[in-house]
Amino acid sequence: MAQIPSLENAPLNLKSIRDKSERELVNLLKDVRGTKCLVIDPKLSGSVSLIIPTSKLKELGLELRHLTAEPVQTECTKVVYLVRSQLSFMKFIASHIQNDIAKAIQRDYYVYFVPRRSVACEKILEQEKVHNLVTVKEFPLYMVPLDEDVISFELELSEKDCLVDGDVSSLWHIAKAIHELEFSFGVISKMRAKGKASVRVADILNRMQVEEPVNSNDVGRPEVDTLILLDREVDMVTPMCSQLTYEGLIDEILHISNGAVEVDSSVMGAQQEGKKMKVPLNSSDKLFKETRDLNFEVVVQVLRQKAMTMKEDYTEINSTQTVSELKDFVKKLNSLPEMTRHIHLAQHLTTFTSKQSFNSQLDMEQTLVEAENYDICYEYIEEMIHKQEPLTNVLRLLVLFSVTNSGLPKKQFDYIRMELLHSYGFEHVVTLNNLEKAGLLKKQEFKSNWLTVKRTLKLIVEDTDTSRPNDIAYVYSGYAPLSIRLIQQAIHSGWRPMEDILKLLPGPHLETKRSGFPSSPSVDSLHGASNGVADGRRSIVLVVFIGGVTFAEISALRYLASKEGMAYDLIVATTKIVNGATLIETFMEKLG
């Protein structure tokens, strides 16, 4: 099965975005004549594989390597480095070149920065006396389509950069990516933003349109009506909760990276243990497309039912008479590999979800979100520390405690901090400082407003029917993600009716019509359902998460888009797909 999703059914022509990036990269590589070795920054290789298959790169006559501190072992006379603007990488590249010079190896060197070159990086190449030996260019990859309705800006550290380091360069990158979309699909005339970073991106985007305007005559009628920008900081509760959709749970337990998950081959039914295999997970897999957004409990039932149906079909094949019936049966057999793959995956997930520890964790999360009994949760977290459970698991629950309670009482905060450092090592003091600076794990200074937010936005939905959901709360089995409730309101009635609630959440908010820009016919009808655009397609809302989005939140948005009376298709763009663990890990640092 193709690792790259086809994108054929995307509400926007995301394939054109992907094809453009592929062409740009191929042209850059073709500009370098002769035998060449492409040395890729390891974090970029996944993004590049979603733009152009490795097989296509090899067809260009390339050797492929990952960038490390070790010298590049190749006979090629041209070495092309494809890297993000990271200072440590410049040291690696300089040492590679110096190593070649010491061995009297003559090569041509090219450094392609993604998405743009950096003065600080080039300064290091100058200091290392290799800048004059290098041809520097840019590969402007600002976004990668992950699937038919999901775009990633591939900025995994943006949340820490903004909240801890005060580095807001990622916000320019986000605005640039959105502006690039506008050059393809027209200027987005309505904007709603919530959070410091989001309001800043909206401002940068407006300035970009003034400095480098999109010509409406070139792109025709705008395809995207509305842009909703949301800071992750506005809702840190949701990612700290365990996702209970199929795709979300796979990410929680196995970690999905660039649209695929890597598992031991024995998980997928192979005899050989210890060998890893990649399982692609995207909309090209019809069964995955059907099940990815369902609550995991339901997925198990769906797979069981499909397996039973296939078994019945198989027993009936003996009495099959007509060619047409045979043809139908063979068609069903074609879906067997998909079925087998997902039965194996679901079986593997069940070994985790059936554990007492998994259910205890869910109980604690529910208790914290419902703000019922903080004492029980505090004792549970203490016990986790004494049992030396993984630090990310402990911090995840602590952050959930802190965010729903506006911090920990001073005595508890000091005690738990000391316990963490004693149990896990004093090198984690930097991690705790980062979380405190980001406002995620702090001392309580005032009473929490979580109860008001929870009650007003109906975040707890009793008796959630996961098999026939009538609310987005099914994705967390009873908790409706705060982020998606806000987006729900923004789509249907804008920010104005919920001003009081928005003031209780972090950061400013903004609602603006970008005057002077032509809009599509339905742009003024955000208050309720519109009739879509003239050619029968639905209007599009672009939802941008700054700081990351979870798969469960994406599932909740897909659920909203599928509801009767919903006049919009939703496209999600994000700095990175995250879960509680991966988000916590971005704040984790060790000394030395």
From Swiss-Prot:
Alphabetical keyword list: Acetylation, Membrane, Vacuole
Reported tissue expression: Expressed in roots, leaves, stems, siliques and flowers.
Kindly give the membrane topology term recorded for this protein: Peripheral membrane protein
Gene Ontology annotations of biological process type: vesicle-mediated transport
Gene Ontology CC terms: CORVET complex; HOPS complex; protein-containing complex; vacuolar membrane
Residues annotated with N-acetylalanine modification? A2
Q: Where in the cell is it found?
A: Vacuole membrane; Prevacuolar compartment membrane
Q: Which residues form a coiled coil?
A: none
Q: Which region is the signal sequence?
A: none
Using the UniProt record, give the first listed, main subcellular location: membrane
Q: Which Gene3D superfamilies match?
A: 1.25.40.850, 3.40.50.1910, 3.40.50.2060, Syntaxin Binding Protein 1, Chain A, domain 2
> What's the domain of life for this entry?
Eukaryota
By sequence similarity, the record places it as follows:
Belongs to the STXBP/unc-18/SEC1 family.
Q: Its biological function? A: Involved in regulating membrane fusion at the tonoplast and the prevacuolar compartment.
Q: How does it assemble?
A: Core component of at least two putative endosomal tethering complexes, the homotypic fusion and vacuole protein sorting (HOPS) complex and the class C core vacuole/endosome tethering (CORVET) complex. Their common core is composed of the class C Vps proteins VPS11, VCL1, VPS18 and VPS33, which in HOPS further associates with VPS39 and VPS41 and in CORVET with VPS3.
Q: What is this protein called?
A: Vacuolar protein-sorting-associated protein 33 homolog
**From which organism does this entry originate?**
Arabidopsis thaliana
Ranked from the top, the taxonomy reads: Eukaryota, Viridiplantae, Streptophyta, Embryophyta, Tracheophyta
